[in-house]
């Protein structure tokens, strides 16, 4: 067998439909677009327009709102913290806070604080001072011999 003899399996590929190649082809003349009208023309149909029928975005009721006062936390996983400690970017002997995480390049911006989640494994004995943490994350930190100080009680 040579490279020029390799073929796809039978039925693995499908011939493309050649449109507008004469009426004998079965998809000539209108090329499957029906007769006249906006959708028969070139160019894209208007998004959300359903041909005079009440569109879905108007049939469904409005719901919810965006709370402009909501706290926005930067999420950091324990695996990322461990990777930074392994790469000697974070000093595990000192207290690790949002500023230390930013300086180490673990997070880009602080926003309203840092929230720690339990993704990944933590082997280092780390003392954290963050705005919030999930319960499994707190358990993993304490199991590794570290400590955590939550700055806001609402973020647990």
UniProtKB/Swiss-Prot annotation:
Keywords assigned by UniProt, alphabetized: Ribonucleoprotein, Ribosomal protein, RNA-binding, rRNA-binding
GO cellular component, one term: cytosolic large ribosomal subunit
Organism for this UniProt entry: Rhizobium meliloti (strain 1021) (Ensifer meliloti)
PROSITE patterns linked: RIBOSOMAL_L15
Name of a matching Pfam family: Ribosomal_L27A
Bias (Basic and acidic residues) ranges: 1-13
Assembly: Part of the 50S ribosomal subunit.
Gene: rplO
Classification via InterPro entries: Ribosomal_uL15 (IPR030878), Ribosomal_uL15/eL18 (IPR021131), Ribosomal_uL15/eL18_sf (IPR036227), Ribosomal_uL15_bac-type (IPR005749), Ribosomal_uL15_CS (IPR001196)
GO molecular function: rRNA binding; structural constituent of ribosome
Similarity-based family: Belongs to the universal ribosomal protein uL15 family.
Role of this protein: Binds to the 23S rRNA.
Protein name in the entry: Large ribosomal subunit protein uL15
Gly residues bias: start-end ranges: 21-35
């Amino acid at each position: 067998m040579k490279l020029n003899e390799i073929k796809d399996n039978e039925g693995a590929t499908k011939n493309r439909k050649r449109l507008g190649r004469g009426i004998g082809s079965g998809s000539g003349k209108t090329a499957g677009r029906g007769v006249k009208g906006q959708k028969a023309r070139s160019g894209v149909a208007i998004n959300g327009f359903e041909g005079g029928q009440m569109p879905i975005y108007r049939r469904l009721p409005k719901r919810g709102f965006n709370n402009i006062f909501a706290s926005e936390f930067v999420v950091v996983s324990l695996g990322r913290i461990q990777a930074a400690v392994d790469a000697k970017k974070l000093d595990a002997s000192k207290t690790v806070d949002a500023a230390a995480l930013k300086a180490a390049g673990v997070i880009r911006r602080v926003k309203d604080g840092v929230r720690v989640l339990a993704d990944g494994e933590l082997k280092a004995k780390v003392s954290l001072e963050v705005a919030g943490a999930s319960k499994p994350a707190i358990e993993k930190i304490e199991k590794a011999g570290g400590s955590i100080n939550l700055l806001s009680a609402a973020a647990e």
